[in-house]
Amino acid sequence: WCKQSGEMCNVLDQNCCDGYCIVFVCT
């Protein structure tokens, strides 16, 4: 789970959108 919005992430992170974190889950 991403800790802060805007950090890079992967699809395994629950709130990862297009390679970057968002504050809440993807819509």
Curated annotation (Swiss-Prot):
- Keyword hit for Phosphoprotein: no
Entry's SUPFAM superfamilies? omega toxin-like (SSF57059)
Membership in a protein family: Belongs to the conotoxin O1 superfamily.
Source organism per UniProt: Conus textile
Q: Taxonomically, which superkingdom? A: Eukaryota
What protein is this chain from? Delta-conotoxin TxVIB
Principal subcellular localization: secreted
Which is an annotated GO molecular function term of this record? Answer: sodium channel inhibitor activity
Q: Name one GO cellular component term.
A: extracellular region
- Give the record's keywords alphabetically: Disulfide bond, Ion channel impairing toxin, Knottin, Neurotoxin, Secreted, Toxin, Voltage-gated sodium channel impairing toxin
| UniProt function note | Delta-conotoxins bind to site 6 of voltage-gated sodium channels (Nav) and inhibit the inactivation process. Induces membrane depolarization and spontaneous repetitive firing of neurons.
* Location in or out of the cell: Secreted
Q: Which InterPro entries does this UniProt record tie to the protein?
A: Conotoxin_d-typ_CS
Question: In what tissue types does this protein appear?
Answer: Expressed by the venom duct.
Q: Which cysteines are joined by disulfide bonds?
A: 2-17, 9-21, 16-26
Q: Could you confirm whether the keyword Secreted appears in this record?
A: yes
Domain text? The presence of a 'disulfide through disulfide knot' structurally defines this protein as a knottin. The cysteine framework is VI/VII (C-C-CC-C-C).
